[in-house]
Amino acid sequence: MKSYRSTRSLLADIERVLAENRPSFHHSPLEDIAALLVEGRHYSWVGIYLSVDSNGSTALLEDTHPAHPGQMAVSTTRKKILITMKIAGREIGYLNVESDRENAFGPQERVLLERVAGALAGFLTGRGKYLVRKAAKPTPVPKAAAA
């Protein structure tokens, strides 16, 4: 159920999810972060992307199986915001958030999303490096398909 949560409460839950994360290739904490943001605010979709190579191409790090209704892009999106995830001035990815509300991204929302992006950047360059490695690794082509 969707309910508007305070910034402090939402940030505390996000930091808890990142701190309690155990490396796993079956479940990503990024899915939990996206779900917390969608359920705790008036967002219709949240995407977490990583800059993988020097060409600026990105890979989606959230893999939703099954897709949470709030994590599917909606054609009625009215507002979008991109927040850069940076560590020491180096861009490592971005947080993409969409809302079906007209005035969804006021100053408080921007501060919240910038703090979430900062927490994600710290996580992805620290304890969450396994997610970066997984996203950067090309998927192998099956031998039958290569022939």
What annotation goes with each model-predicted range?
Residues M1-L60, G126-R127, K134-A147:
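Intrinsically disordered, low-complexity terminal regulatory regions
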Residues S24, S57-T77:
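Allosteric regulatory "coupling" segments in signal-transduction proteins
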Residues R78-I87:
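A short, aliphatic-rich beta-strand micro-motif
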Residues K80, I92-Y94:
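Structural motif
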Residues K86-E91, R127:
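Flexible loop/coil segments at beta-strand boundaries within sensory signal-transduction domains
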Residues L95-N103:
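Short beta-strand-to-loop transition segments that serve as allosteric relay/switch motifs
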Residues F105-T125, V132:
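Amphipathic alpha-helical "output/dimerization" segments
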